[in-house]
Amino acid sequence: MALIHLCAVLVFSLSSTAVAVDVQPRREIRFAVAAHFPPFQSRNSQGQLVGLNIELGNALCEQLNVRCTWVDQVVMENFPALEARQFDAIMGMAPTCRRRKRVSFTDDLYPITTRLVARKTSGLRPDRRLLKGKRVGVLVRSNREAYALSQWAPAGVIIRSFWLNDQLVQSLVSGDIDATLQGVVEIREALLDTADGLDFDFMGPPVSSGLLGNSVAIAVRKTDTALRNELNHALEQLMQNGEYQRILQPYRLGVLPARP
């Protein structure tokens, strides 16, 4: 009987310890980021991370009273590293139907639009019949690559994948590719608002698909509902206190409405 009582005490003690560990306040959020996508995330001449996603991430951490740690990645969609707990979340990713099978997402941070960009005189449109035989540049492991390989490549469109957007834009300007499928904000920054972009423009209507998504959110492990809920709550507070609108205003985005 004494042995049973001792075991019960040990079990209760261990359970209490486990509960105590679980309720420890969060002190840090490690955000993964691919720092070569201005104006969303990049490094300035001093090597500091700057951009919309960096500002939003830092504001969320400040709202939660935790330290923000940024972990550089070559590509955004590094789910194996997320699942291996090399970081806690991936900052700034479109929550597509394909990605939702692997990870969970927070509420939307802001909307995005995908467009085809080519020379003004090309006559191209985001129609796979018109793009047949044309070379379209996309970024490796991006939602646009997944869409182009799935929807356009089978129709004879030549899909060229690039690790860096700078390389993709250089290939477009030099004529090594005929067009690119990009987000409106980043291609403005990378090409259309520069001297090299004078001969280029958006061609045809926006491209919509479940493979592309129409917004950006934060990816977390499917099991980490606590972090997702904390980030959602912090985002709601930023929307209500006006900080969210202040951060987004310079980036020429359609601002999501503040929540009641």
Where are the regions that the model predicts?
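Acidic, polar ligand-binding/catalytic clefts
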Residues: N58, E62, R67-L130, D196-L211
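Ligand-binding clefts/hinges and TM-proximal coupling segments of bilobed small-molecule sensing domains
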Residues: R67, N143-F162, L198-F202, H233-P260
